């Protein structure tokens, strides 16, 4: 039996923008302007480049299985806000990922809170790989502005 990698463990939305996520907080699909429209995002991977006191660099993929990680995911009561808590056991780093869609805006917002619970001094740089769905008509695109990535569809 094959594993269904597109199983939604959580869904957030506002009636126009709908986002499906897995249990680790990875975005599986994003729909706009209706929940049954084609998905706008093909894949998004978030990683953190970490430098420690010994100048060794490491990569921690937040939604990956590279390190032994405990996950806990829950909605903030009576909201469309989803919090995914991640604790990387052998690195003593905790990450809170917050996803939400404002009720009157056509956007998905994601925020990270990172806490170093070890005695080592570390420097963290976020990294993002993002792919958008497109076709021969090139109707989807993206741009970076003020520490944010914006995906958009020309025809909507």
Language-model features and meaning:
Residues 1-156:
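Terminal accessory carbohydrate-recognition/targeting modules of carbohydrate-active enzymes
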């Amino acid at each position: 039996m094959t594993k269904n990698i597109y199983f939604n463990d959580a869904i957030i939305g506002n009636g126009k923008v709908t986002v499906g996520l897995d249990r680790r907080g990875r975005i599986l699909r994003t729909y706009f302007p209706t929940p049954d429209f084609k998905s706008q995002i093909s894949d998004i991977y978030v990683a953190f480049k970490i430098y420690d006191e010994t100048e060794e660099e490491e990569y921690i993929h937040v939604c990956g299985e590279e390190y032994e990680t405990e996950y806990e995911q829950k909605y903030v009561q009576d909201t469309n806000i989803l919090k995914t808590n991640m604790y990387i056991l052998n690195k003593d780093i905790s990450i809170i990922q917050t996803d939400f869609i404002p009720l009157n805006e056509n956007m998905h917002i994601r925020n990270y809170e990172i806490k170093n619970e070890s005695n080592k001094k570390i420097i963290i740089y976020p990294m993002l790989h993002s792919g958008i769905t497109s076709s021969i008509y090139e109707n989807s695109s993206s741009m970076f502005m003020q520490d944010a990535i914006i995906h958009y569809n020309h025809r909507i």
